[in-house]
């Protein structure tokens, strides 16, 4: 049985309705005032921002732009353009000094271990997001997708440290299609995925395969229950 990307096509209108209604339900059920989330200007966070603003209204959303020295300028420009267009409250906090302070505090810090160093950045961002959430009575909205979750391609207690994942049941290729459905700018919907933890980092180069290759395989195993040899 050969699974292809065509097998992952879904009704994106229905998908948007399900996600936005759940976002409203989650706030009401838990007595929360709104959502706070990190917005990087990348595909996943942009889709999540559009969905949550549409679902609960821009006044109940707080976006945090958390750049540091390795953050591409164009990503911050895309993030800023999007939050302004959606009329979402936002703050820009450059985390470079915080990250450098953590580095200096670690006796065994190794400048050449870019994975461990990159994860410091992700965890600093998580800490800031949860300060806002605690102070405002908000929930932290995560932006990881199903492909990243199944591949383990996230930072534990970093971008994995959230309260809910609205696109956590959508594969990366589906999120890209959803971005087009939501009419996000093409420079976002077609942007190459990157965790943004060091300069030049690209997800597919680091993984060694494309999401177009991985998603049908993951779908066959985890959704259809097929043996890997059958996928």
Regions found by a protein language model. Give the residues of each.
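A non-catalytic, amphipathic alpha-helix used as a structural packing/dimerization or gating element
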Residues: 14, 18-22, 170-181, 223
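Residue-level recognition of oxygen-bearing side chains
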Residues: 183, 226-227
